[in-house]
Curated annotation (Swiss-Prot):
It holds the Pfam family DeoC. It catalyses: 6-deoxy-6-sulfo-D-fructose 1-phosphate = (2S)-3-sulfolactaldehyde + dihydroxyacetone phosphate. PANTHER family: SULFOFRUCTOSEPHOSPHATE ALDOLASE. Belongs to the aldolase LacD family. This is Sulfofructosephosphate aldolase. Keywords: Carbohydrate metabolism, Lyase, Schiff base. It is an enzyme of class 4 (lyase). It comes from Salmonella typhi. It comes from the Bacteria. The gene is yihT.
Amino acid sequence: MNNYTIKDITRASGGFAMLAVDQREAMRLMFAAAGAKTPVADSVLTDFKVNAAKILSPYASAVLLDQQFCYRQAVEQNAVAKSCAMIVAADDFIPGNGIPVDNVVIDKKINAQAVKRDGAKALKLLVLWRSDEDAQQRLDMVKEFNELCHSNGLLSIIEPVVRPPRCGDKFDREQAIIDAAKELGDSGADLYKVEMPLYGKGARSDLLTASQRLNGHINMPWVILSSGVDEKLFPRAVRVAMEAGASGFLAGRAVWSSVIGLPDTELMLRDVSAPKLQRLGEIVDEMMAKRR
């Protein structure tokens, strides 16, 4: 059996410059907020995702797709560039309490062998981390996910995202990110996708300290995501996180959110989003070169 390795989803530099287009109901809300005709049809999301994959994947080391809206279509249309690896989201988002993702389980519809035949090299699992929910349940889910990936020769990418506790109103996001890393940072996955400390805001020195603290608890390669980070601050966030030990990014919003709902989507992706992704890739290479 062919077992993929981390090198299969990195750039030649060894760094990760990966594009996410697996947002689901959150993306529908983004279209609505941008003034799109509501209710926003599934086809609007599918078209955007497939176009983004076609236009942006040549600049990414990997692209993350979701089964619900775009994976099948992307495969059928050969949307992903040959030079770009494919990652498939294996998480089932359960809405509730007025938010699009209130709970997450492993998607039972995922067929690891079939996605591998289609060319996927990794699966990704979102793990919601709340201080007052059972840690063992999270660890068990990650273990099951790792087994699903590794028994099929696929890479395992976990994405712990912190949320306020179910009960009570005290929430220290920064401490929660660290606590989640303490719990899941040595859980046997191949890659850890993490929220940027301090939303990438403030003094560089503070960001570096926070990122170094995070690095101390993650015993696998790690990358940052861009949700919650101002897209103008994201390139710096990538630099600082990598200075602290990260190996790149797996991000969507910082690359394409500014073109959501604009006319001439393909043109906007080409002229606005592609240069952003290209520059981020250069930053990753630059930071990796400093490690030699």
